[in-house]
From Swiss-Prot:
The lineage of its organism: Bacteria, Bacillati, Bacillota, Bacilli, Bacillales. This is tRNA pseudouridine synthase A. Gene3D superfamilies: Pseudouridine synthase I, catalytic domain, C-terminal subdomain (3.30.70.660), Pseudouridine synthase I, catalytic domain, N-terminal subdomain (3.30.70.580). The active site is at D53 (nucleophile). Its EC number is 5.4.99.12. It comes from Listeria welshimeri serovar 6b (strain ATCC 35897 / DSM 20650 / CCUG 15529 / CIP 8149 / NCTC 11857 / SLCC 5334 / V8). NCBIfam families: hisT_truA. The gene is truA.
């Protein structure tokens, strides 16, 4: 039995998230369906670095699975590329150590959120970015982001449905890239992220850019450890991308 590590990308628009759900199209279900065909009806379970929600995309999701097929990793990659749907891509497949674990072995992740600042709505980007036709002060957004960097209890910045006992996470950086006059990319790097955390942080920073909230408001929300203390809305899923997963 050989363990394989794969880096995959997917367009989340047509999926009800990553994780298998009854009577729903998911990324995990489509990949396991392909692996089952390759293994002549035998179920092969895959494990990912983490789940993504409905409509959320991935540029560098990492999964692992075990197989007893006598084929090379390169052939695995080519076969899975053909056998999975057009909205999933296998970027790499490599043999991995037997103790490699896509979820528990992570030391950091990067998420990016894409904001389109066009005055007129672009229907061709509706599934891949947030349309935000309002003025933004990027300097205020950067200032607001500074109080979020470091180790904090992010209870105020995650969904009440978060299942984790500890809400303490470390944000290494929040960077802002203006790719052009119309496109703003917000990149979040940290040791881990809670349910809806990046989308709530994005909504908060957009409010800061509009002057609706200040750095002091964000600091107070952090200390309150109560989602109800934060007035910012959760940014919609279509602008969010799991960009990269890091391992030791």
């Amino acid at each position: 039995m050989t363990r394989y590590k794969a880096i995959i990308s997917y367009d989340g628009s047509g999926f009800y998230g990553y994780q298998i759900q009854p009577n729903a199209r998911t990324v995990q279900a489509e990949i396991e369906k392909a692996l089952k065909k390759m293994h002549k009806g035998k179920n092969v379970r895959i494990t990912a670095s983490g789940r993504t929600d409905t409509g959320v995309h991935a540029k560098g999701q990492v999964i692992h699975f075990d197989s007893d097929l006598d084929i090379t990793a390169d052939k695995f990659q080519k076969a899975l590329q053909v056998m999975t749907p057009f909205d999933i891509s296998f970027l790499t497949v490599d043999e991995a150590p037997a103790d490699f674990h896509a979820r528990f072995g992570t030391v950091g992740k990067e998420y990016r959120y894409i904001v389109k600042r066009t005055k007129i709505f672009d229907p061709f980007s509706r599934n891949f970015a947030l349309h935000y036709p309002y003025e933004l002060d990027i300097a205020k957004m950067k200032l607001a982001s500074e109080c979020l960097i470091g180790e904090h209890d992010f209870t105020s910045f995650c969904s009440a449905r978060t299942e984790r006992d500890s809400k303490v996470r470390t944000l290494y950086s929040i960077d802002f890239y203006e790719e052009d006059e119309e496109t703003l990319v917000i990149a979040f790097q940290g040791n881990g992220f809670l349910y809806n955390m990046v989308r709530i942080l994005t909504g908060t920073l957009l409010d800061a850019g509009q002057g609706r909230i200040s750095s002091e408001d964000i600091t107070e929300a952090l200390l309150a450890r109560d989602r109800q203390k934060l007035i910012s809305k959760t940014a919609p899923p279509q602008g969010l991308y799991l960009w990269r997963v890091d391992y030791e």
